[in-house]
Regions:
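A binding-site-centric feature that preferentially detects glycan-recognition modules on secreted/surface proteins
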Residues: 1-119, 125-207
């Protein structure tokens, strides 16, 4: 799908209302050269943070959500190994869900991804990818976005949580049965493995 078509989809989902920018401004942010390209159009958190993007996700007619115990999602930034274009809208090339990295912990997966000449996705990138292709979120085939991490409150190092996107089972902590089957932005411990969560990555980024 061309970037112009992806921007149209985001406009249909309400990007103008979310950003307070009109269509002309958003087209200008992408740039004419990129509109005819392919890839995945990403909404930078400076334009719309992940917590506000998540409700645009849908599955089985249910909107996405951020787990209630992740109110600090906006404080998750980039790990040192990853750089993204400092523009409101940019493009990913070669996104992979990372199914072959299911049952790998984020700590184990990061060096493997880097050794392949790739980098992991951020949480905004993961949401942006699913907004364009919701079918990529499947039972037992979901993914972590380990490029987004939160610094520790005090001292060096990172908070032990890594964001992930999967499908809610309607647990009470998710808000109950009405959210069963909905897209869910949550977190996993960086040292834990999950048989149903891959580690998503990308070949390159551009603007």
């Amino acid at each position: 799908m061309f970037i112009a078509q992806q921007l149209d989809r985001l406009l249909d989902l309400g990007l103008e209302e979310l950003t307070g920018r009109d269509e002309e401004e958003l087209v200008e942010m992408v740039g004419g050269d990129l509109l005819a390209c392919t890839g995945t159009l990403v909404i930078h958190p400076s334009l719309v943070p992940a917590a506000r993007l998540a409700p645009l996700l849908t599955r089985l007619g249910k909107p996405g959500f951020v787990v209630p115990d992740m109110t600090d999602l906006g404080r998750f930034g980039l790990i040192p190994e990853v750089e993204v274009p400092e523009v409101p809208l940019y493009v990913l090339k070669g996104v992979e869900r990372g199914d072959d990295l299911r049952d790998w912990s984020p700590e184990e997966a990061l060096p493997e991804i880097l050794a392949r000449g790739r980098t992991p996705l951020t949480v905004n990138e993961g949401i942006s990818w699913l907004l364009q292709d919701p079918s990529r979120l499947e039972p037992n085939h979901c993914f972590m976005t380990i490029a987004s991490r939160k610094p520790k409150k005090a001292g060096p190092g990172l908070d032990k949580r890594t964001p992930a996107i999967w499908i809610s089972g309607g647990a009470e902590r998710d808000g109950g049965k009405e959210r069963d089957g909905a897209p869910k932005v949550g977190w996993c411990w960086a040292g834990n493995r999950h048989t149903w969560l891959g580690v998503a990555s990308v070949a390159g980024r551009g603007a």
